[in-house]
């Protein structure tokens, strides 16, 4: 009867489908044949609802057959029929009216413990206890007492839902007979005491051993059936439960029990800690088993659901589906249920070997096919049924072969299921049937033959579902079977579900797999391979990565794991390395199948260690990451390619620089990958990468490239930064970019740097650096954003790549030849490669070894550098402040990666110093140089050491230097990171400033790539610096603006910077001659430089005294600059040495651009401001337009800067004067991005007190960075990209410089008018502010120092003069300013603002800041100084420019952020204010001026002429007046800027800070912020900025907004052409500039998109035409046209 009963019950309701059975089958049968043999057949019927008609007939036959078969069949059948009929009718009603009450928390059936969902509910008539209809019916078959309270009931009330009204009452079946029969059939459970098996409702089952005990037979008889777990006397000890349970149970069951940690196997056991609703008695267990069987059989229909679908995530869904199929809706999937029934019957069949089984089979058959069912309706059906069951139809065979299963209920698509082929026990466990052991027959549910077994296997998936459905029921009631099933299913599911069971190693990482899948999906179809099984793998990475993955991935992954860990350990980014490397294997080439496989895990960890992990990925030469990683930290060479190939980089201190250390080593060397990873290295990956770009950056980094390629593409796509046309490149580039940013994260953490190094090793060297070189990545767009995670591992190269990829397009275009040799500087010098000339950039990146990573990383992820400076400053804790400053470094510097490293070790600043001249020094000098620079500068030993390439730091720094300094101009974004571990006496808390070098100008790529790209950018920067030497202030300002622009802006800026870089690349190309000249000049300078390492030194010099390199080097570089070219920085800045270059540039560009600059300076500044104001907004378009606009303006700004170039000349003179005081240095700083060099000279001059020079050096560093605003813009993009990452917060610090975007265009524009005039006076003022500003970020950690810093505020000169220490401190303080310290993370911009304030003693910092700000405003003229200022406090630069209304929005946003940060710092600013106030009035006094000018500078910035004039005369009043006019934007930003820029200048900063404090808390409008700031500024000094100024500003803002709109429209219109490469970046910028100008000057004052599109198209056609005739002409023409326009 058990079988019969079960069948009936199943049919009626007990089956998992029980209620559904009753509902579906019985309802169906009821409807069709209200009284067919519903008892047994209703189940069949239910089972085969689809065959309702046939089933109906079958049901009749079956009923007849079954009734005879099942002893209790007749009774049950009749009862069942009634019950089913009622149930069926009810079910129909239920189905019609049932609404899902599927709350797991909802009431649940005490029997099955399943929550009442939509299943029909039955309640005994005598009580209000609710049970699943099938459960209570099944229960009633055994006992007519309520399972809960044991009250006798004669009828079951059927309700549609819990608490639903009674739809019908069905009489309780006479279950006694059934029970007896069942007991006989089944191995009965006998009371251990009395030996009887009756009174099952009182026969308690031990939860431990399943032994039966009658309640009365227990020693103290139980009056109530225990609802909770009950253990027999023997199992009284819970610990024994599992054993006991296992003992009687089959081995499989035992295993299941063991698997089920919970010892109780009681099915009644509440799920999830819920107490049993009813006692676990033999009856309850029988009922539960029956219900379970029924449901399982139902579920079995669903069993074909792929096991992987059974995974936990799908559990709920499956549960819902299964529930619907089984108990939930009481609608048994007809077909599936029958098979389940069949199995169930088979199980019973074992017990009742008779017709029951046959019947079951027949029923199954009927279920199988309606037609067959009809045939089977007769006895034949019975026999046939059995056969059918075992019989394999063609369809079933095909389906089985294909793994197709009947669709899960609710789905119309057949589910694909790949049987796991588990043992019956496992299947049972999956199903949760293991608890059948309770019944004594573990195989009761598995009566089938092997065929049935197979079914069982599928059932297991279904079981999983069932389990999921009734997980509570199965788990609670049969924890043994169910939990095990769940566990097994899940365990198996992972193995089976993910078809790649082998791949399962990563452990199913849902998120990772999703991300990987997404990345694959995002990849261009060309890069994805669709396998027969439907799986996707990345084809692009496949060549290397995939190939390697396929062949060696498993092996390599394991090896990577092993290696990685070793490498990772050395790298400190074990996890990053481990996962990073292993994943880099797979994850990095996300496209790789393996990568995909690993990606899941990878991805999961990627977010955390995407920096590290991705880096290895990127350099899929995980070995490099693995082996190399441990090494490269210590040795740069290994970084190349995943192998420890020094890739010819050994000579290049920046082994990674040998992304191919030297471009010479181009692709071939990268293949030198670690012996371990010969696969990757030797893979043709590099060629592939190479094809990505003429610069075979990727080629060079075979592993890296490939990994980069795929992940880049994926990331690219995900980031959306990759141009459609450049999937491969963009991907590779993107990945590095992404890695770069991630590297930042890794670098940020002490351990991370190594990982990024490893990545840098792989991808950075290969792809990242290679990218820079090969510019094979077009993902400069994606540059830093999406791939940040991946790039992270690219660490040094990675970050370089990040920016470089931005550059890479241009590089690709212009640097087809792999200029990977470290000698790249020479190449750069001789070659006028694309502004993105990858050669320079790449050269530098390769030079920067993974150690150099820090420096290299920074470019890619501005913050990354800091973290990468792990060897020296492994303690890069957080990027406090990311300030970008433009550094003009001689390309020679690129080749000079070595010089810095020696000093680098000294400066825990790691790459910051490594970036030393360009970035490292900047960072270190800002943070470390400010603190450590004095040490380093004073103890030039660091710098002296720097020449030694071996030093890891040296390498890194050198690399930094190389990439950053390699670039002619590089916007060095100083990411201030608290770097407790920095060994710097002067900088107790050396906030490591990651100096992200964004190549200014065309090199705006991301700073991430900066290293790798920076070199590339360097070429661009060389040209740009040429441009920017003229328009350095402008460029720097622009870059700064970009950088300063809000974090979002920065992010976008990164993106845009990539674009901008492309554009700049074009303009740089246009000025390629200038650039080439400049490079040559720089190279000469560099060569002249005492250091043979033209790269680092040159960087350092280029970078204005190599502020970024290291303090010592900076000073030395400054001195050398002086020696060599009167000032290399000048040479770069257009100072003495760059005099020729500058003259050339000025002549070449100023002529064409002076007009353009003057005319467009305002327009561009407005446009840029507009863009910037937009850019601060998250709008990518806005930012992009900002960048683009910026870029188009860049040439103009460059022109303007060039105009200022004469100013730089004057500044150069001041530079010469710089020796005598800070003023000259300031002038120098102010002069240009090259001013960085100037500043170093100034510092050199100030170097007399070595400490002061450090400050200057820091300032210089800042200056270069800020100066490189073009880069800054791209840096902004980088930041933008970074914004996605934790680092981005730090980048937000840089974002404080996001203002740079605004400042960039504004200052440049504003300055353009009077840029040349103020340079001399402003530069001086600027210098101090610059220094201070740099200090701010540098000392962001040293908040405590701010108080000590008052000196600096009092007088920057003092800072330089009397306080090398103080200066260092002041610098440190500025660096430490809250901006650097807590703000950075808290609010990117706000942080920076705060840092400058707090870090710098309110007075000193603010004062410096003020100066800085003034410098910023003077940025165009005193670009060097301003960049320095901007660099440290990114906002300063931004703000200075922001004040130029165009930037106000972005500036405001940045300011708000900064202002928020400054709140805490307000008091110090006040202090500063007072101090500032004193010097403020004194325009002649550089320190005072900065203070006075800080606010005025802001104001002045708004009005170019006014600003310049004000800057000229640092009279507080005029500047303040301007701030008043500028308040909405400039003021708000300016206060922050002032806070940061005027870190030393208390007045401006203080007032700004104070006003800002309240405003910052709430993102007050720019005007609000500006107003308070203005007021403070006015308080500090007679605020010249009056209503007139404000009105003027408002008008300007209107124009700016219009310009922004115009820019947006133009960009939208030109975008397609640019994407199609119909226009070069330069042309893009020119067209953008011209079109915007034309649109803005249109009389209608309206912006008609159609007209804009036509205009743009006309321009595009014009340029195309011009290009045909003369490409160079076209390149130069844009500036001219811009000037004309």
Curated annotation (Swiss-Prot):
SUPFAM superfamilies recorded: FYVE/PHD zinc finger, RING/U-box
Compositional bias of kind Basic and acidic residues: 671-682, 1065-1075, 1130-1143, 1151-1165, 1192-1201, 1577-1591
Low complexity bias spans: 835-860, 1001-1010, 1292-1305
Gene3D superfamilies for the chain: 2.30.30.1150, Zinc/RING finger domain, C3HC4 (zinc finger) (3.30.40.10)
Zinc finger region(s), RING-type: 109-150
Top-rank taxon, per record: Eukaryota
PTM annotation (Phosphothreonine): residues: 335, 1416
Keywords, comma-separated and alphabetical: Coiled coil, Metal-binding, Phosphoprotein, Zinc, Zinc-finger
BP-aspect Gene Ontology terms: mRNA processing; transcription by RNA polymerase II
A GO molecular function held by the record: protein domain specific binding
SMART domains recorded: PHD (SM00249), RING (SM00184)
A Pfam entry, by short name: SCAF11-like_C
Residues recorded as bearing Phosphoserine in the entry: 450, 460, 817, 848-849, 867, 870, 922, 948, 984, 1002, 1135, 1139, 1205, 1372, 1383
Zinc finger (PHD-type): 188-238
Coiled-coil segments on the chain, per record: 1589-1615
Region annotated Disordered, chain positions: 1-82, 333-390, 449-483, 537-590, 606-777, 809-860, 892-1229, 1290-1355, 1369-1390, 1421-1448, 1466-1501, 1569-1591
Bias (Acidic residues): 41-81, 922-934
Biased composition (Polar residues): 606-625, 637-662, 694-709, 737-751
Biased composition (Basic residues): 339-364, 372-387, 1011-1031, 1054-1064, 1089-1102, 1117-1129, 1181-1191
Assembly mode: Interacts with POLR2A (via the C-terminal domain).
Full protein name: PHD and RING finger domain-containing protein 1
Underlying gene: Phrf1
